[in-house]
């Protein structure tokens, strides 16, 4: 069982996360359903954020002459970067001494109820782990995203659903499983099964015969009508698989001119076979795309009748942004602020 000191460290980390969420108004209004802008939260907390090609370190919290800073490695996927950022932010918020972290913070559970799964670590590390998990994946965010996507607890028995949820949350697959287990969305036994799945295999299953060159760095976003209004913060090499129901029997087709105009290259475009015995059912348009340039702004796709494009079109609106955390240097908004002041 988790000892008292371990439990106290976990609770202290959670309290720190709740306090910062409250102070930054992350737990009210529309913010409750949005992935946490952890890089922005670091800046709002008064620390300088820097990206550097660290190896083997994932990140570090430093403090010199009263000035706080956080350094993150550019050599990790976005989900890992974000968890590391939240972990280092936890060190800052909880008043810890400067510290550097390696991949050990990704392998251990932030909490658990059996001692075999909770390796003993210093109290400050346990606090920062708990802070990071709760800050990036608070109960209200999980609940809001489940409602938006139409996910029920039984859907998370499928590793594919957990992987797609991790992209919406902006966390690693493993961190997402721990948070779902923490909130009793999945049980302990199922959580162990889910952790045995490999995200790289889930990505390849989505892509079928399309060759994925870098399974560690590239994520595959599976987008459907359920993603209406979603904020998509992707890495520059990510792929986007759109599977959209198409009422072709009534003459409706999805148009993707907007996708091209926004800077996407369409890699595959086709329709899935209609299941036997379902003649007249909507077909599923299947499009695989990749962003050729950084994204930033609203993208609206339309399902229309070509001869009457303004006649009751079906819309899918996404808000797309390319993460720049793979570039070395000062966090972009802080760099722009310094340039404006000079």
Predicted regions mapped to residue ranges:
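Active-site hotspot residues in diverse enzymes, especially metal/ion-binding acidic/histidine motifs
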Residues: 1-288, 295-342
